[in-house]
A protein has these predicted regions:
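N-terminal pre-domains immediately preceding structured catalytic cores
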Residues: 1-178, 182-219
Length: 219
């Protein structure tokens, strides 16, 4: 099942947030230094638990490992000393989500996107015109960066990538890939080398509810 296209068709979820921490306004602010100058991400309708933060980490994975908890909609980059950077994510729809162990096989800045044949068949009016590929840019579904997941040296066709749909973070909407805010994928990209291990969990939470409360309050 190849789902490299990583696009979604679900509309935004309206979840108003009255106040935004100025630190987060800066964190998700514009990036004019990018090859395609990146505007600020509107986080006013994003559940604040999906905004990037450092947390206590009680998992067993080694530092440098990326752990994707699809049930909780979090991605963790494990650090030393029982800590991790936690990012909010959007994940694949039920029946399309991928899970397992992989490694970062390659990395790309403002990556090119090509819809798969299956994606074109499902939504020809949306995807057929890009059968030859779409160059990187602000309208590209992969966003500002992409990390390509490989298993035993073989491309799994799944990516950790940015998004043109920031409202989708925290939701189950994409076609199998794992999406982050563009500012977050830029941050993650800068921290992980090719070869970094990735664990994608499905059907289970990395932490139980009590542990998640402890993790979130540890920031």
């Amino acid at each position: 099942m190849a789902l490299a296209a990583c696009v979604s068709t679900q509309g935004p979820v309206q979840q108003a947030i009255r106040r935004i921490d100025p630190a987060y306004v800066a964190m998700y602010g514009p990036r004019p230094d990018e090859p395609h100058p990146l505007p600020a991400t509107d986080i006013s309708e994003v559940d604040p638990r999906f905004l990037r933060r450092e947390v206590a980490y009680y998992g067993r994975e080694e530092p440098g490992t990326i752990v994707v908890d699809t049930e909780s909609r979090y991605l963790y980059l494990v650090r030393e000393g029982g800590r991790a950077i936690r990012y909010g994510i959007g994940v694949g729809k039920e029946g399309l989500a991928w899970s397992g162990r992989a490694r970062i096989g390659r990395k790309a800045t403002w990556p090119r996107w090509t819809p798969t044949a299956a994606m074109i068949r499902r939504e020809p009016e949306r995807n057929a015109r890009w059968a030859g590929g779409m160059e990187g840019g602000l309208n590209n579904p992969l966003g500002a960066r992409a990390l390509y997941l490989y298993n035993n040296g073989v491309d799994t066709m799944y990516r950790l990538h940015g998004t043109t749909e920031p409202w989708s973070i925290g939701q189950s909407v994409s076609s199998g890939c794992i999406r982050l805010f563009n500012q977050d994928i830029i941050d993650l990209y800068s921290r992980v080398p090719v070869g970094s291990p990735v664990v994608v969990l499905r059907g289970q939470r990395l932490f139980d509810v009590e542990d998640e409360t402890r993790v979130s309050s540890a920031y």
